[in-house]
Amino acid sequence: MSKLGVVLFVFLLLLPLAAPQPVGDQPADQPADRNAEARGTYLYPFSYYRLWRYFTRFLHKQPYYYVHI
């Protein structure tokens, strides 16, 4: 095995295996915990109608953004 092969083997395979694993309470996990309540909310069918009504009213008030389908 060449020297380059040994270096690649050590750095690409052995070093990641020996690295400490991250703990569960990392700062990167916090936004997912904060958004758990937002993901848990359920939009009822009437809610979609209300959102569509508000959206169309907004488009009618802003004629430059209005796209007629």
UniProtKB/Swiss-Prot annotation:
One of its GO terms (molecular function) is ion channel inhibitor activity. Residues 1-20 form the signal peptide. It is found in: Secreted. Expressed by the venom duct. Its main location: secreted. InterPro entries: Conotoxin. Transmembrane segments: none annotated. Residues 21-69 form a propeptide. Keywords: Ion channel impairing toxin, Neurotoxin, Potassium channel impairing toxin, Secreted, Signal, Toxin, Voltage-gated potassium channel impairing toxin. The keyword Signal applies. Pfam families: Conotoxin. GO terms for cellular component: extracellular region. The mature peptide does not contain cysteine residues. Tyrosine-rich conopeptide that specifically targets voltage-gated potassium channel Kv1.6/KCNA6 (IC(50) is 8.8 uM) that is expressed in Xenopus oocytes. In vivo, causes seizures (at 5 nmol) and death (20 nmol) when intracranially injected into mice, and causes paralysis (at 10 pmol) to C.elegans. Belongs to the conotoxin M superfamily. Conopeptide Y family. This is Conopeptide Y-Fe1.
